[in-house]
Amino acid sequence: MLFRSWTFYRFKNFDTYYYLGGQELAQYTGRVAENEIADIEQLFDYKINGRFQFIIYNKLTDFEQSNIGLGTDELNTNTGGLTKLVGNKVLVYFDGDFRHFKEQLRAGIAQVLINQLLYGGSVKERVQSAALINFPDWYIKGLITFVAKGWPLEDDNQLRILLHEKGPKHFNALCEINSTLAGQSLWNFVVNRYGPSTISNLIYMSRVNKNIEGGFVYVIGSSLKELNKNWKEYYTPIYQNDDTLFTNTNEKPALKFKKKTQNITQLKLSPDGNSIAFIENNSGKYKCFIYDFSKNKKRKMFKGGYKHEASYLDEANPLIAWHPSGKYLTSIYEKKGHYKMDYFELGKNIKRTSSKFYYFDKVLDFSYSSNGNDIVLSGVQKGQSDLFIFNPRTKFTRQLTNDRWDDNHPKFVMNDQYILFQSTRFTDSLKTTSFKQKEDLFTSNTTDLFLYDCLNFSPKLIQLTNTPLVNETNPLMIDNAHFLYLSDVSGIKNRQLATLDSTIAFIDTSIHYKYIFSSESVSNYSSDIQLQDVNFNKTKTAFINFYNRRFNLFTITPQAILSSRISQLNKTTRRKSIDRDAIPKERQNDVNTILDVTNQDNPVKLADTIKHASNSFITDFPKSNNSEKGNTSISIPTPKDSIISVVSDSTFYQMPKQRNYDVTFA
């Protein structure tokens, strides 16, 4: 395999190991890891012993094949589970989303630090300490997750759904359902109630007392029983108030999924809207079905994968899309480390044609042009996700974007002249970027919508949304003037309807148009819309929503959407908190504005930080370099809630010398 030949960069406090195709990811890790290590050390008031070794995989399937740590006792004492970890080796992979990649880095750093704090630095110390101290999963995994990504909206909504109506009545019951989310929510409660410095104090006193009960009693004066009660009293009124602001789905479900925890990762309406294809993914083992609305029957098309208990799920494998003719369904999937493209010709007997698809490390999404001759896709090459046009007949691929911003969910629109897509970019100019320039590391932590003129291959994009705190995802076009997309502007992922209009800006040798984009809410559901799609004929849309304690499939016509505008936009408590605290007062009106896309302001730079005082306990842990400065700034990240990630103060960054690593990790 390609990843047997390793190369690495040696930085001051860590090394980044990579193989063919992963150099750019190693450079990115080198730019951001130093700040993340210092930030997490400051949070825990502890200096990590030893050097980090970040082992970087280009994709999830390579990551799953790793044999690092096999045959040692270290995996048996790995108290985490969110990131593969052996000693100070942190294993991460790239799935096309730099936000998730950075979360993995933070989770791995936090995991190493927590292991050292609780169990000591060496394997011998960990084994001895593990026999004396038993920390539950919610404590360790919840803390690692909270340090990695804070308390984002999707986790807040997941907890609200679990606690809704007939959900778990107490904290321990929630732990049986989802111990990581339970612990993450408890640490969020502790930080909000007692401050971020409480984290390091609790860990230290838990280690001293050899149990977590003693730590909580000594630091916050509450037993675990009292703490769990306070946790419930903290979240219950918040979610009860939120529930009064939103409504359940009133439509009758077109299809009810049998399993309450069913993961539907793909949803594609047939061109005529009479049937729908979807992927059921059960912990890595997937099945593709086509459901006929009129016959109320579903037909299995194919299956694959294998079931595993890992915490990661590849939602982009497999991918499916209908050919505009409706005669066959196309699937792009990964098997044994290689991509394939299969065509399923529909009829009484399904005819399957398979071809190899060599071009990408990973494919994130794809869709057909209206004539079926071309495919637009989001593909990963050399550690970045870009847009490409692929011709299935000639096998010719043309790259449209080539930069460090994450581009996904592309669709041909407006008679195939434009491509509608979502991206983390904050500029409307296309250019080639690298991680050596400081400006190329500015990345929006939320996604906006863009239009690309693929007829003229314009270097200038049309930016449709500019919402620094809001994620716009899954864009669709339901007629010539209206877009439909999902937005968490209310704190819950609901439908937004957007209208694109144009006026003449000026005339010289040709007419130049100025585009105006406005949006409004057209759904007010109390739970996230997971996926949505519209058929080629624009007669039906479909979406998946949580209803009656399970996920269900609903359909609605575009005409009904156009007439279902919401007069007042309600927001969850968590969304209000983000809007209030995360941006300067002078920019608070930017959260949901009508955007003139020809005259945009650049997003402001913002660090999502929490101020706190020095720890009140004197510990025997080594102090971090910044711990003697009195009042300091600690970052409890909510990556998708902050505006811009900035990782370096230098304009140009000189990478260290590349070194070959000849001995395979084992």
Regions found by a protein language model. Give the residues of each.
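A flexible loop/linker signature enriched in serine peptidases of the S9 family
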Residues: 157, 260-261, 279-289, 306-314, ...
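Blade-terminus and WD-like Trp-Asp/Gly-His loop motifs, strongest in beta-propeller folds
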Residues: 267-275, 319-328, 366-374, 410-418, ...
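Short coil turn/linker residues within repeat-based beta-strand modules
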Residues: 295-297, 336, 347-350, 393-396, ...
